[in-house]
Swiss-Prot record:
Location(s), subcellular: Cytoplasm
PROSITE patterns xrefs: EF_TS_2
Broad class of where this protein is predominantly found: cytoplasm
Gene assigned in the entry: tsf
Stated name of the protein: Elongation factor Ts
A single GO cellular-component term on record: cytoplasm
Keywords on record: Cytoplasm, Elongation factor, Protein biosynthesis
Signal peptide residues on this chain, from the entry's feature table: none
Source species: Cupriavidus metallidurans (strain ATCC 43123 / DSM 2839 / NBRC 102507 / CH34)
InterPro entries for this protein: EF-Ts_dimer_sf, Transl_elong_EFTs/EF1B, Transl_elong_EFTs/EF1B_dimer, Transl_elong_Ts_CS, UBA-like_sf
Length: 292
């Protein structure tokens, strides 16, 4: 059997970006043949990626990219908070955000087929899954290219905001931070989704009905609750986080600035995380051991 040297392992790692121990195992299995070892790793890492693909990805990062009046905000998911801090994963996210801004893909499927590093986005993603051992997905993205000015704000890597505006950049950055903190669902009250209003109205009706007041009073109570809700969740009507004596709209008017739109991404929002039942897991392991 051929001797496996450190330089051989380093060369294979440079070619495949696989972990050192995986490179050494592949070289041993290939009896020192670098070409065969590389092929073995490609197959092995591909299988590893396939196995990981079914696992829930509720952690991750939000990445932004701005070039003039074109920008992109992207959410990428992984399985653990640890991997969300991995330099390779962060680097992949930065490249994806730049591609979205520059190539304008219609959706994640189109984005996945775009060229990246001499391959495709999806191939690079799969290779990264194989290297790190966790499932990773590109969940969603938004692209701005309407000619307005853009600013972004990232709270760590878990919350990302992009704001399109005309006027004062410092004020727009304050708005981006406000959005991250207060999480409005729309720019103005008339843009709040109908399903959210209907849900809030239903809750208000149930509460008002319990008051025992006359129907006309109940109706006014319900309408008052709905209007209060609309002010609380629409950006322009919210109290400005840095000065609650004025609304966001009033602050913007004071500096002659207009917000044309915004996007807020929170990592894992709406994704159902798997809850580990350790007692059940131990019981299953004991049962399996008894059968063996």
């Amino acid at each position: 059997m051929a001797a496996i040297t450190a330089s051989m392992v380093a060369e294979l790692r440079a070619k495949t970006d696989a972990p050192m121990m995986e490179c050494k195992k592949a070289l041993t299995e290939a009896d020192g043949d670098l070409g065969k070892a590389e092929e073995l790793l490609r197959v092995k890492l591909g299988n590893k990626a396939s196995k990981a693909a079914s696992r829930v990805t509720a952690e991750g990062i939000v990445v932004s990219y701005i070039d003039g009046t074109t920008g992109a905000l992207v959410e990428l998911n992984c399985e653990t908070d640890f991997v969300s801090k991995n330099d390779d994963f962060l680097g992949f996210g930065a490249k994806v955000a730049e591609l979205v801004a520059k190539q304008n893909p219609a959706d994640v499927a189109v984005l996945s087929a775009l060229e990246m590093d001499g391959s495709t986005v999806d191939a690079v993603r799969s290779a990264l899954i194989g290297k790190i051992g966790e499932n990773m997905t590109i969940r969603r993205f938004v692209r701005y290219t309407n000619g307005g000015k853009l600013v972004s704000y990232l709270h760590g890597t878990r919350i990302g905001v992009m704001v399109e505006f005309d006027g004062d950049e410092a004020a727009a950055k304050d708005v981006a931070m406000h959005v991250a903190a207060m999480k409005p669902v729309s720019l103005s009250a008339d843009q709040v989704p109908a399903e959210l209003i209907a849900k809030e109205r239903s809750i208000a009706e149930q509460k008002a009905a319990e008051s025992g007041k006359p129907a006309e009073i109940v109706a006014k109570m319900v309408e008052g609750s709905v209007q209060k809700y609309l002010k609380e969740v629409s950006l322009l009507n919210q109290s400005f986080v840095k000065n609650d004596k004025q609304t966001v709209e009033q602050m913007l008017k004071g500096v002659n600035t207009t917000v044309k739109g915004f996007t807020l991404y929170v990592v894992g929002e709406g994704i159902e995380k798997k809850q580990d039942d350790f007692a059940a897991e131990v019981a299953a392991q004991v049962a399996a051991a008894q059968k063996a």
